[in-house]
Structure formats: structure tokens, C-alpha cells
């Protein structure tokens, strides 16, 4: 029984020592994130749709900052996001990638034709924001409040029962386009 407690104490001391070493190493050898990547990532819409060719907003921000990727590939963010990134990086704005720029693009949501849905769940697996609910061999539906209109669920559907449709603006869904409202920062003078 005495050997048992010695073994427990030895393993506990080893765990404590290795934990302290790992804690010290994590602070001593920490790699600082690129602040430009952080700022670009904050500007991007965080829809994680992949329309830019990257698996999410963070990898796209890293590609812009580190690899010189074009700043005009974010379809959900549109021109407003591209202009903010251009201002941050102090580069010339570029037209949107392959599309005519629109100041206020219509919000699109996926709609499933429930009569043709076979419940294969391929659209659920493709949706980056989990806006589609349903079960295997059961009818699926899209939660329009969560849908970003990224179009990633349309191609995997074997019965082609998913389409994107514009959302009609109602008093409940209408929002100010805050990107068109000019904002000026006025420095405050402190008098002592």
C-alpha cells in the first residue's frame, strides 16, 4: 500500500513539473498573431461561405495579408467590405471579382422545394452556418434568419430542389445600410 502512494505522489509531481514547464514555454515562446490579419478578419462578414476560394474568413484574411491575395473576392461582404479592406491596407479599390459592383445587393436565401426533397442531407453537410434542418429521408427546410445566401448548398443537391431567392424587405427585415453613412472621428481637445 505504501508503494501505491509513492507512485501516486511521483506521477503527481511529474504532472505538476511538466505542466509548469508547458505553461512557461507557452508564454516564453508564444507567437504573436499578425495584427493586420486580425483587423482584416474583423472586417470580413464571418459567413465562412468559401466563395472566395478559402475555407473561411480567417484563411482569406491571412492570404490577403501574407500572400497578397486580391481584396475583391468576398461576395457576401460586397463592395463595402472591399472598400474597408482597401482603406486599411492603403491600396486602390478593385471591382468585385467577376461581378458588377452593387452598393446594396439584394439579400438572398436558399429555398428548398419540399415536394422534390429526398432527404439526402448533402445540403446540410454543405451549409457553413447550419441554416438547414432536417433528417435522413425526411424533408429539409432552411432557417431564413441564419441563411447567408452563400450558394454552397445548391450544387450538392442531387434533385436540384434548392434555389436562391431574394428576400423581400419588410419593416422587420429592413436594416440601415450603415456603410453608406459617413463617419468622421472628431478629436477631443482636453483643457487642463
Curated annotation (Swiss-Prot):
[4Fe-4S] cluster 1 binds at residues 49, 52, 57, 74. Binds 3 [4Fe-4S] clusters. [4Fe-4S] cluster 2 binds at residues 117, 120, 123, 157. Its main location: membrane. It comes from the Bacteria. Belongs to the 4Fe4S bacterial-type ferredoxin family. RnfB subfamily. It is an enzyme of class 7 (translocase). Residues 32-91 form the 4Fe-4S domain. GO terms for cellular component: plasma membrane. Residues 1-26 are annotated as: Hydrophobic. It is found in: Cell inner membrane. Keywords: 4Fe-4S, Cell inner membrane, Cell membrane, Electron transport, Iron, Iron-sulfur, Membrane, Metal-binding, Repeat, Translocase, Transport. One of its GO terms (molecular function) is electron transfer activity. Residues 108-137, 138-167 form the 4Fe-4S ferredoxin-type domain. [4Fe-4S] cluster 3 binds at residues 127, 147, 150, 153. The keyword Nucleotide-binding does not apply. Part of a membrane-bound complex that couples electron transfer with translocation of ions across the membrane. Required to maintain the reduced state of SoxR. This is Ion-translocating oxidoreductase complex subunit B. Its EC number is 7.-.-.-. One of its GO terms (biological process) is electron transport chain. The complex is composed of six subunits: RsxA, RsxB, RsxC, RsxD, RsxE and RsxG. NCBIfam families: PRK05113.1, rnfB. Its cofactor is [4Fe-4S] cluster. InterPro entries: 4Fe-4S_dom, 4Fe4S_Fe-S-bd, 4Fe4S_Fe_S_CS, 4Fe4S_Ferredoxin_RnfB, Elect_transpt_cplx_RnfB/RsxB, RnfB/RsxB_Proteobac.
Amino acid at each position: 500500500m505504501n508503494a501505491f502512494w509513492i507512485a501516486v505522489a511521483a506521477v503527481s509531481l511529474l504532472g505538476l513539473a511538466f505542466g509548469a514547464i508547458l505553461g512557461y514555454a507557452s508564454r516564453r515562446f508564444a507567437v504573436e498573431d499578425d495584427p493586420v490579419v486580425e483587423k482584416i478578419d474583423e472586417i470580413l462578414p464571418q459567413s465562412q461561405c468559401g466563395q472566395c476560394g478559402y475555407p473561411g474568413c480567417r484563411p482569406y484574411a491571412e492570404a490577403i495579408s501574407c500572400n497578397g491575395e486580391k481584396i475583391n473576392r468576398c461576395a457576401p461582404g460586397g463592395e463595402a467590405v472591399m472598400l474597408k479592406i482597401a482603406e486599411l491596407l492603403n491600396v486602390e479599390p478593385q471591382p468585385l471579382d467577376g461581378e458588377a459592383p452593387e452598393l446594396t445587393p439584394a439579400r438572398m436565401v436558399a429555398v428548398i422545394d419540399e415536394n422534390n426533397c429526398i432527404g439526402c442531407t448533402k445540403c446540410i453537410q454543405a451549409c457553413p452556418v447550419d441554416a438547414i434542418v432536417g433528417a435522413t429521408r425526411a424533408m429539409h427546410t432552411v432557417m431564413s434568419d441564419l441563411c447567408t445566401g452563400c450558394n454552397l448548398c445548391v450544387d450538392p443537391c442531387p434533385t436540384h430542389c434548392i434555389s436562391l431567392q431574394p428576400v423581400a424587405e419588410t419593416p422587420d427585415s429592413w436594416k440601415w445600410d450603415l456603410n453608406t453613412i459617413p463617419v468622421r472621428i472628431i478629436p477631443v481637445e482636453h483643457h487642463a
